[in-house]
Amino acid sequence: MDQLKQSLLDAPIIEKDGYHYFVHPISDGVPMLRPELLREIVIKIIRKAELEDVDKIVTPAAMGIHISTAVSLMTDIPLVVVRKRQYGLDGEVSLSQVTGYSENEMYVNDVYEGDRVLVLDDVLSTGGTLAALTGALEDIGADICDIVCVIKKEGGENKLADDGYHAKTLINVDVVDGEVVVVDDYGDD
């Protein structure tokens, strides 16, 4: 069994405001992230993502950063982090992130009209973060070459799909009766 699948099956589940979360090194930073798990994930992303002609990797803070940094190192594609803090730099674009559990403002810097981007994130759950991000990238005039998330949590509204985008995933899971259940070992293409 691969490490990503096993690590999800072993993940503890917590409940917050009626929403069930798995606690995982990729999505939460705890338990500790082992290098062999990160390496496996990065290799799977590189194999699955459409990387030809990509100018930049774009990832939302905070839990996409470690994944995207590793992919950037392996592909030599520069990394742009969409931040939760406004800096007021020239060209900064704001977006409203609405997820199943929070609402925040985020800020895109260093993405320009005509840039060809790969969007990477840790988990696709409600699609709120990625829907807001793809909308901002469209407004900028960037070309979204591909969207890849490590984990898809099934069972929720997918605002990203509602906006006409499809995210590739490495594995699809659900939380049933307090446990992670693997719905698709290989995720979505």
Curated annotation (Swiss-Prot):
Classification via InterPro entries: HGPRTase-like, PRibTrfase_dom, PRTase-like, Pur/Pyrimidine_PRTase
SUPFAM superfamilies, alphabetized: PRTase-like
Keywords linked to the UniProt accession: Purine salvage, Transferase
Entry keyword annotation includes Isomerase: no
Record GO biological process: purine ribonucleoside salvage
Disulfide-bond pairs as recorded: none
PROSITE patterns: PUR_PYR_PR_TRANSFER
Gene3D superfamilies noted in UniProt: 3.40.50.2020
EC number: 2.4.2.-
Function description: May catalyze a purine salvage reaction, the substrate is unknown.
Family label: Belongs to the purine/pyrimidine phosphoribosyltransferase family. Archaeal HPRT subfamily.
Protein name: HGPRTase-like protein
